[in-house]
Amino acid sequence: MNQKRCTKKWTAAKRRRQSMTVSESRYRADKTERPGGIRRKYFVIASAQDGMPLEGMMVIPSRPRAVLQIAHGMCEHKERYLPFMRYMAERGYLCVIHDHRGHGASRREAVSADADKVLGKKQDIPAGLGYFGKDGGRFLVRDLHQITRIIKKQYPGLPYFMMGHSMGSLAVRCYLKKYDRELDGLIVCGCPGKNPMAPLGSALIQMLQKMKDPHSRSILADGIFANMFDRPFRAEKLIHAWICSDHTVVEKYNKDPLCNFTFTLNGYESLLWLMRSTYDRKGWEVRNPNLPILFVSGEDDPCLGGRKKLLQAVRHLKRRGYDRVSFRLYPGMRHEILNEKGRFRVYHDIAYFSRVKQEDM
């Protein structure tokens, strides 16, 4: 009798896991990650906003006890988070991430004659990278929520955490404005400091788009919004040294065509929308004021701009009405704290935060 019950439960769980294949998305074959029964799955859905294909990846433990949804940063892709996702899956977290629009495999081929050109010179950039589509920033946030609803439907009742890194940290805070009731905890990683020049930057991008095309790429825009972070590390003579103190990580990033590319003007317009919306005082519904929120950043991250900027970001959420906001700064670490040599300290802190918040529920 007990064996029959177990068989029925196992069959029901299997059907639940497989149902997304039929109703919501297209999966690739499972890939076994570790002997403990951890599996990796890829899926593709169409964005409910404009049909943009979104490719996602799940790392699933044998017995999930919570969900962690991850929003990656600018000019990178979901596979870079596999080591962290495996670490969390080994501790019972079902981890899900998708390539944001205009990143990784979530892109349409460019449609403009000026696409993928920088000042008239053709770049070796995979078509569609860095192009978000019309209303890209807002749609990116809604894409995140679409994934949330799919996962909650397939794995109902599990505590649900979200983490965003860099541009993703802007996206998850924009998500918070409307969808905070979906979450049981939020981790804000590699937070960009508030930039008072963002409105001026938006005006510049709009002017460039009138002169050129939303698909076009601009060295001027890239220099203003991205390359400036390398200035404190010029002595290291390594492009993108600002992202990590481990040069092996940086060199791998530089060789990855899905990372080392120039945003389109449309991409920068979408990024600046996320920045403005994140730090805007308007539009916050705050339906879950007791939501635990943890900021984690590297002390040497030039994108953050120092401890003062981090405290400003923390205060911003507290003033919007969130009561349980905390932070951790990691000495000697730069922007990508999940890839630093001391990354397991960060992994541990995130896992501990999530576990403690589950126990408080």
Residue ranges and their predicted role:
Residues 21-61:
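N-terminal cap/lid segment of alpha/beta-hydrolase-fold proteins
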Residues 65, 72-76, 166, 299-300:
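Active-site glycine-rich loops that stabilize anionic/oxyanionic intermediates
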Residues 85-124:
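Conserved alpha/beta-hydrolase
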Residues 155-166:
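Alpha/beta-hydrolase fold nucleophile elbow
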Residues 172-258:
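Alpha/beta-hydrolase-fold enzymes
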Residues 295-297:
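Short beta-strand/loop motif that positions the catalytic acidic residue
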Residues 320, 324-361:
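Catalytic active-site module of serine/aspartate enzymes centered on a nucleophile-bearing elbow/loop
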